[in-house]
Amino acid sequence: MGTEEVVRTNTVAVKVDFASLSDEDLVTYCQQQLPDDLTAYKVLVERYEGMVFNLCMKFLGSRQDAEEIAQDSLLQVFRKINQFQGRSSFKTWLYKIVQNYCRNRISKIIRKREVQESYEDHAKEDVSTTTFDSADSSEKSEYIQEALNKLKPNDKEIILYKFVSGMTLQEIAEVTEIGASAAKMRYYRALEAFKEAYERVTKNTQATKNI
């Protein structure tokens, strides 16, 4: 996609390479030009759509849900970009949007599951359907996802922000709206909980394979 465009400032025409601009400059252009000109918005989408999808995928575990929520989150950026005031980085603001959409979807999934279980008293998640043929990277990914799913929601969020999104502890503090020291403590507790969950998953899997 071409990201260069001639922008008129008063009476002067300036050629702008949008792909080289910072997030903050792109946001400024969006606030000035949307909905008439989508160039700056499209650059922001291309810059973050991969990370947004990966985060949604880790939160939700379903590709269909992740694609839908990622699309909804980026559309919300289009709708709400004029409300961005620069008190945090654009990335932090975006991840707050993603976090809220993922939480809402998870709540809907849980409610739906509870309704189903009220009619199917024997309904349980079948975790034995996965066949482990070899200890390859896909197997390790399954272990990681299962361990993540065993964490408390707040612990899972922090682990995903740190390792999937590459956020700093300061950015995590801003997204979760807690102090920097509290974010650091919560991160280390979450990391310890993840390590314990991962060890249990791998031990249980190995024990099952040896039967």
Predicted regions and their residues:
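DNA-recognition helix of helix-turn-helix
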Residues: 155, 164, 169-170, 174-201
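Internal acidic/polar
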Residues: 19-20, 26, 112-137, 141
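Sigma70-family region 2
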Residues: 61, 72-89, 109
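N-terminal module of bacterial RNA polymerase sigma factors
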Residues: 1-50, 58, 211
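Structural recognition of an alpha-helix C-terminal capping motif at a helix-to-coil junction
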Residues: 54, 68-75, 88-100
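Amphipathic, Lys/Arg- and hydrophobic-enriched alpha-helical face
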Residues: 45-63, 80, 148, 197-201
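Arg/Lys-rich amphipathic alpha helix in sigma70-family domain 2
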Residues: 83-85, 99-117
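C-terminal edge and immediately downstream basic/flexible tail or linker adjoining helix-turn-helix-like DNA-binding
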Residues: 2-9, 143, 174-177, 191-211
